[in-house]
Amino acid sequence: MKKILALVLVFALAVCASAELAEEATVLTHEQYENAEVDSPVCVETYVQATQSWWDNTITVYAQSEDGAYFIYKLACSEEDAAKLVPGTKIRVTGTKIEWSGEVEIGDPTFEFVDGDPFIAEAEDVTALLGTDELAKHMNEKVAFKGVKVVGTKVEGQDGEFPFLYSYDGSGTREDNGVGADLYFTVEANGAQYSFTVESYLCGNDTDVYKAVEGLKIGDVIDCEGFLYWYNGANPHITGVTVVTPAE
């Protein structure tokens, strides 16, 4: 009887060990994540680069590893753990690969902290890739745009053009939601125009970048940094703006 119990125990331990190994094997490289079908389960290990505001036990995370980046939408997270999701922190994320208006992201995600040295991504200059299919390969990465020109944006029902808008249609204010409406501005590069956004839950109205965009003038030439979000085309979430040549 004791031998039978011992064999049962050994078998149970072996099953547990196999399950743990199988679970570890499900962690995908970024290439495997890219090749996974939309709506399929995914598990990745990556590093926090920035977060939006925590709310209702969720937080949206911009994450990146040496081999690629992820937009992790509404990560289930306590307020206590949210405070620990500082840039460089390594996490393992499990969720579903989803696509919305061209943006590929991880939905319904959960996470756990993983031991490891911190990693902070450097912004890659992708200015030359604007308007090319190659740009999408950098989706969600920390990127830079150099020497782009601010052009005017029109608002329906109003005369003139504006260097930026509070909300996509100009209907917002800097007081919305306590952090201000998202800021939208248009830049010209490589002979075409692109819409850039300051996502206020990422960089609110008290941040340097929000104030910098509020101070832009049509014709300013600027350098920008941010995360390459996608919405029916490139729509970067901008985290830094520097005017390099003021408008005349």
Give the ranges of each region predicted by the language model.
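Sec-dependent N-terminal signal peptides
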Residues: I4-A19
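OB-fold single-stranded nucleic acid-binding module
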Residues: L21-E248
